[in-house]
């Protein structure tokens, strides 16, 4: 039996709502419904009664519940034990491409410099979209997530690392927003609400990317402008702030599982400033 089906069953039984279960599992509501139908077809019984928004376990569902919990707990324990034997000296850090390029690459270098030679700690720098990394963290496939928005989930702990400043940059001086094409750089799911007030409502980006370096390299060719971290842009050189634009401050968070077995290591690593001179 697919453990993902049991996981979905447990989440629906906990929330009694397909929409909320979908949000918790980072799935669409139709995918959750499909998984429940698959499980019901495999077992040959209905697991839930559905009357509008009133979702309840059937008698068969009530009987399955303790077995599903036991199976999932056993599976999680097995995964954790197997993973521990193969990666006890490994530590995975996940973030978007832009965060790695603009600030985390330097932080990783400082971490290596501060490591004791005998520690044998091996880092994995993982690049992906925030939603994918949150799912990996939830499933214990990732140790630490660095992001601009803290997930609103009880099983996560977070630490505010500080703030960094974004400004709207282009490749030549004294340019206005109306003269430039917009290159959208993804700075987190809540950035769009800030972006809307700083960019014309009808502005359609000619390029959308998660890489600050790619956006920077395309500014001249596309006669464009993009939101870039001020310190990083100054280090790169050759960039100019758009004349009629403002600046924007963004938070940076470290996120980890509350019951992470690497909590002590996480605390030690976060003693090294991530936003060095940002």
UniProtKB/Swiss-Prot annotation:
GO terms for biological process: negative regulation of DNA-templated transcription; regulation of DNA-templated transcription. Residues 18-37 bind DNA. GO terms for molecular function: DNA binding; DNA-binding transcription factor activity. Residues 1-58 form the HTH lysR-type domain. Keywords: DNA-binding, Repressor, Transcription, Transcription regulation. Belongs to the LysR transcriptional regulatory family. This is HTH-type transcriptional regulator HdfR. It comes from Salmonella typhimurium (strain LT2 / SGSC1412 / ATCC 700720). The lineage of its organism: Bacteria, Pseudomonadati, Pseudomonadota, Gammaproteobacteria, Enterobacterales.
């Amino acid at each position: 039996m697919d453990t993902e089906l049991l996981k979905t069953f447990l989440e629906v039984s906990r929330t009694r709502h397909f929409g909320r279960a979908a949000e918790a599992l980072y799935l669409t509501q139709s995918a959750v419904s499909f998984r429940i139908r698959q499980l019901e077809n495999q077992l040959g019984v209905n697991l839930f009664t559905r009357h509008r928004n009133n979702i309840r376990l059937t008698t068969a569902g009530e009987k399955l519940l303790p077995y599903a919990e036991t199976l999932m707990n056993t599976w999680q324990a097995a995964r954790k034990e197997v993973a521990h034997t193969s990666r006890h000296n490994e530590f995975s850090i996940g973030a978007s491409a832009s965060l790695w390029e603009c600030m985390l690459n330097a932080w990783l270098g400082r971490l290596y410099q501060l490591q004791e030679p005998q520690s044998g700690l091996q880092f994995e720098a993982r690049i992906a979209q925030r939603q994918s990394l949150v799912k990996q963290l939830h499933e214990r496939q990732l140790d630490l997530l660095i992001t601009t928005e803290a997930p609103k989930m009880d099983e996560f702990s977070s630490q505010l690392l500080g703030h960094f400043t974004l400004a709207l940059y282009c490749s030549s001086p004294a340019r206005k927003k109306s003269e430039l094409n917009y290159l959208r750089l993804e700075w987190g799911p809540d950035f769009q609400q800030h972006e809307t007030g700083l960019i014309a409502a009808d502005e359609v980006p000619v390029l959308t990317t998660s890489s600050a370096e790619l956006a920077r390299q395309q500014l001249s060719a596309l006669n464009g402008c993009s939101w870039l971290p001020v310190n990083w842009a100054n280090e790169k050189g050759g960039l100019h702030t758009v004349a009629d634009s403002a600046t924007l401050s963004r938070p940076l968070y470290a996120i980890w599982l509350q019951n992470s077995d690497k909590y002590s290591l996480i605390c030690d690593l976060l003693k090294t400033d991530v936003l060095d001179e940002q």
